[in-house]
Amino acid sequence: NLPPEPDPHDIGMPPWLFIRTARNTMVGHGGSVTIPAYSKQFDWELEVAVVIGRECKDIDVAHAMEYVAGYTIINDLSARDFMKRPHAIPGSAMEYDWISQKNFDGACPIGPWIVPSADIADPLNLDLKLWVNDTLMQDSNTGNMIFKYAELVAFLSQRFTLYPGDVVATGTP
């Protein structure tokens, strides 16, 4: 959702989504993350996430932000060596396994805070920076998102009900 340069083919397309199981993948501030023993290609993705404050279903973009209670950050960890499925037909819907690479214990550190929506003057102008050890690995701004917060919340609410406390990650720079 935050590419260095948007692919013209992505403009006008609906958001591409995957789901993360919250019970075992989410880990709070100060929690531990264990790199899965089966992965040799482990990486990270800094993302802003919106936290839903009110139940919503079938809402439109114009009203979507009324349902956002606040913002937090997540680190979307991935076992990249499990991204491509062996023997899958290249370009097919079955080529990538987003569940295995994204859903393992501790795969999504979150927080440490939820900042109320009212306390962020312009959520579409937040700098995002991620360092690994002392090396800056990601440097972007939420203004670069292809799909803005309201678009993502509205789109998801048209597929299933969102409840207070649901977390919608917005993609990585």
Which sequence ranges carry the predicted segments?
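Extended, compositionally biased flexible segments
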Residues: 1-39, 44
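A generic local secondary-structure boundary/capping motif
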Residues: 5-8, 34-42, 48, 56-63, ...
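Structural motif
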Residues: 15-17, 24-25, 32, 47-49, ...
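Short, structured patches in soluble enzyme cores that scaffold and shape functional sites
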Residues: 18-22, 44-48, 52-54, 72-77, ...
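Short helix/loop capping segments that flank catalytic or ligand/cofactor-binding pockets
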Residues: 27-28, 59-61, 81-83
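Alpha-helical secondary-structure segments
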Residues: 65-68
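Catalytic-pocket segment enriched in acidic/His residues
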Residues: 80-173
